[in-house]
Amino acid sequence: MSTSTPSIFSRIIAREIPATVVAEDDRVIAIEDIAPKAPVHVLVIPKTEQYRNVTELAAGDPDLLAHLVATAQRIADERAGGQFRLVFNTGEAAGQTVFHVHAHVLAGELQEGTLAG
């Protein structure tokens, strides 16, 4: 994705906007969601803004997608005994509001009406 305005996630990665970082390496950053829908709600975000959604990421860089999933698993292992939901919203009608691919790691009881079981 190439735009003149960086996404909010790119601004977090650049440390222009504060966030609670729970994991980071050279390829991804994981932050606490600012409006959590479950006791554990972490966003895992690739540091590249090249991909708008998970289907673009899977086609363009499957190794980065695998790394993102492995990072999600590590977070779930540390915070939720390894049990978690991994959610990618793809498209505005599906609830995607930031068009910089990211995964939601959710664990524990979800807020009512958040997701189908």
Locate predicted features.
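HIT superfamily nucleotide-processing domains
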Residues: 1-117
